[in-house]
UniProtKB/Swiss-Prot annotation:
PROSITE patterns: G_TRME. This is tRNA modification GTPase MnmE. SUPFAM superfamilies: P-loop containing nucleoside triphosphate hydrolases, TrmE connector domain. Homodimer. Heterotetramer of two MnmE and two MnmG subunits. Mg(2+) binds at S237, T258. Residues 223-383 form the TrmE-type G domain.
Length: 461
């Protein structure tokens, strides 16, 4: 275990609440807390047992005045989150008592922790690897049960085990190649280029299985960025309100009511969906509305999915066709809204013929008709209908990139072997593939990148 100074930070959100928790970790953590703690009947923390709590008060050192009534818990390293001696002070929730206790801890020798420093210490002390550390922040930011379960599996080390299994297989190939090249006179089992290629193809299949689910994983982690577009007054804001079951967007009969972008998260069977309601796209002389239209177009560029809404009670016109042309390179669903106002089936069929889309849904948002069909369509477009909660899903873009680079190096090694170049040259590519996978667990990652990853964490974590 590495030696560090003693750090402290508030582990709960700032503001009023039932309790606040101040965390302190490091070799001197027990001594520091003991110096400002006064137990019932003047009992100190000198004899506190690990993994127990003690009731008492935190006092101001100089004045000896009581700051707050507290419960102190003690976790002895290495059996703690950071693998160091760690204490947590539970005080009354509120800004003043929390700040005063934190100030006393710092005055007594602790240093204010940097964002993510507690988790970083757990990583540096070998209690967790980097993929498990990143899973901690994914758990905190989870928006659905499914995204949380996926993050929990990663935190438990499921991804790490799979990555380490592949890396161990790679290192065995490298070791065998190097032994064959360096000690040709020894009685070693001969390793041929053909045998290495077979092993590498099996490794690539394993990597492919992880990569194939990574797009789904990105959505679980960040949410499916879904943008509702269409001309003014086709029902975009009504759709947003219906999906979130709340009157978030203003709905009127006046075209152009929505002039800015409205964003909300919804949960479709565990899949987090970021729904973006945009200003109606049309030619306008209104300066403010023009800005809204430009923002709408920017949001379309960023979208994973576009829901293109049309009004069934009106004929398709040039503006509709322009929007259709603008979104043609995106994944999109066409929503034919206001079914309740359309009585002409021939006109409805004409609409469908005009549209170049496999995914056309007829709705009446006003009557909540067609919304379940829309949700099923979204699931089928991105997740083939469902995601099983027990599946290992790569949710991190950094991990996805490392897997892709590792795969490319394996393919390069196969090409080298196919050209019948000396097998020891192929070992360079295999070692690169091994190194890229090590970036996922943090075994072969640059220290600056590690610092950047932990800087994205919140204070106290």
């Amino acid at each position: 275990m590495k030696e560090f100074d003693t750090i402290t930070a508030v582990a709960t959100p700032v503001g009023e609440g039932g309790i606040s928790i101040i965390r302190i970790s490091g070799d001197k953590s027990l001594d520091i807390v003991s110096s400002i703690f006064k137990g019932k009947n003047d009992r100190s923390l000198d004899d506190i047992k690990p993994y127990s709590m003690r009731y008492g008060f935190i006092i101001e050192k100089e004045s000896k005045e009581i700051i707050d009534e507290v419960l102190v818990s003690y976790m002895k390293g290495p059996r703690s989150f950071t693998a160091e001696d760690t204490l947590e002070i539970n005080c009354h929730g509120g800004v003043i008592p929390t700040k005063k206790i934190l100030k006393e801890l710092i005055k007594s020798g602790a240093r204010l922790a940097e964002p993510g420093e507690f988790t970083k210490r757990a990583f540096l002390n070998g209690r967790i690897d980097l993929s498990q550390a990143e899973a901690v922040i994914d758990i905190i930011r989870s928006k659905t049960d499914l995204s949380m379960k996926s993050a929990l599996k990663q935190a438990e080390g499921t991804l790490s085990k799979e990555i380490n299994s592949i890396r161990n297989r790679m290192i065995k190939i490298i070791a065998h190649i190097e032994a064959t090249v360096d000690y040709p006179e020894d009685d070693l089992e001969e390793i041929t280029g053909q045998k290495i290629k077979v092993d590498l193809k099996e490794i690539i299949n394993k990597i492919d299985n992880l990569i194939s689910a990574s797009e789904e994983g990105k959505i679980l982690r960040e949410g499916l960025n879904t943008v509702i577009v269409g001309k003014p007054n086709v029902g975009k804001s009504s759709l947003l309100n219906a999906l979130i079951n709340e009157n978030k967007a203003i709905v009127t009969e006046i075209p152009g009511t929505t002039r800015d972008v409205i964003e909300e998260y919804i949960n479709i069977d565990g899949i987090p969906i970021k729904i973006v309601d945009t200003a109606g796209i049309r030619e306008t002389e209104d300066v403010v509305e023009k800005i809204g239209v430009e923002k709408s177009k920017e949001k379309i560029d960023e979208a994973d999915l576009v829901i293109f809404m049309l009004d069934l009670s009106r004929k398709i016109d040039e503006e509709d066709i322009e929007i259709m042309d603008f979104i043609k390179n995106k994944k999109y669903i066409v929503l034919l809204n206001k079914l309740d106002l359309n009585k002409d089936l021939n006109e409805e069929n004409h609409f469908i013929k005009e549209l170049d889309s496999k995914y056309i849904i007829k709705t009446s948002v006003k009557n909540n008709s067609g919304l379940n069909e829309l949700k099923e369509c979204i699931k089928n477009l991105f997740f083939s209908g469902e995601i099983k909660s027990d599946e290992l899903i790569v949710t991190n873009a950094r991990h996805q990139e490392a897997l892709i680079r590792s795969r490319e190096s394996c393919i390069q090694a196969i090409e080298t072997l196919s050209d019948e170049i000396s097998i020891d040259l192929a070992s360079i590519d295999i070692r690169n593939a091994w190194k890229y996978l090590g970036e996922i667990t943090g075994d072969t990652l640059d220290e600056n990148i590690i610092d950047k990853i932990f800087s994205e964490f919140c204070l106290g974590k």
